[in-house]
Amino acid sequence: MSLTGHSIESLATEPGLISHGTDHEETDAALLERVHARLRAAGDVPGATVQHMLSLADALASFGLGRFLLRHQGLNAYWTHQLVTYQPGTLPASNAETLEYQMFEKLPVVLATRERFGIFRSQLQALMKPGATAASVPCGLMGELLLLDYSSLPGVSLIGVDLDQDALDSARALAATRGLTERVSLHRQDAWALDLRASVDVLASNGLNLYEPDDGRVTELYCAYHDALRPGGTLVTSFLTPPPALSPASPWNMEATDPKALSLQALLFVKIIEAKWQTFRTHAQTTAQLQRAGFVNIRFIDDRARMFPTVIAQRPR
């Protein structure tokens, strides 16, 4: 698996996307210099000097994922898929001191979303029945559905919805490699304006709420998912929980996190990259939003660190 491929130009994005930007005019060198200037102007921060942050920015600029994050401040379908399907040990241990290795192998939120992806797949596999219709919104590469086992599930139909045409093209390619082309239909559409009224048995959604700070908008998103499901249908979604520094209600299990990796994560995503996914919600907030959208039988499956819970909810019969 290549971890450094895909030029920035080949990952052009679409207007209206909230997870990653669309500006490709600035050269990599100019972008890095702009980041350097911002870091110098901000000065030292607790636990890190300007010089240390400049060196981390340079390290980010040396590999594909880092360059994408510096430019877009979020993840697209390709890099999300790379992170969640990465097999630990793919990067050799001789690279252990590199930032790329640390990001793929050590950062707590990366480990949490990879664990979350595994939870999604196991839950979705259990929910699949012959003849069912399942949707992924936004679908990205649609790995949580396309990587399932359909050998004993005749008649299952799969729907992918995304605003990003690159994501849809990549999902189509993955469906072909999995021998699922005939089962899959792909639609370029806004998640808040789904045209799937009461036609889906299972709907999977990861990532969109992380980029939406407006709680009302997230509730509206859950309403759209509710309306897309048939009565009795199931939503499988997720959310990021707040760190202890931001909320006394933080559920994080600090015993399951590496303190050094956690400090590096905060420095990278908050200070250097200024990541757009810094929208956190508690289990209680998520329960309230889903209930307002009409869902019942809400239950949570936490990752070990309790950073990226999976939540499963039903549309009433």
What residue ranges belong to the model's regions?
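Class I SAM-dependent methyltransferase Rossmann-like catalytic core
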Residues: 60-128
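Conserved SAM-binding loop of SAM-dependent methyltransferases across substrates and taxa
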Residues: 140-155
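Conserved SAM/SAH-binding beta-strand->alpha-helix loop
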Residues: 164-166
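Conserved SAM-binding loop
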Residues: 171-172
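A short acidic, Gly/Pro-enriched loop at the edge of an enzyme's catalytic core
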Residues: 192-203
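A short SAM/SAH-binding and catalytic strip from SAM-dependent methyltransferases
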Residues: 201-216
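A short glycine-rich, Lys/Arg-flanked "PGG" loop and its adjoining helix->strand segment in the class I
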Residues: 218-231
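C-terminal alpha-helical "lid/dimerization" subdomain adjacent to the S-adenosyl-L-methionine
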Residues: 236-293, 298-300
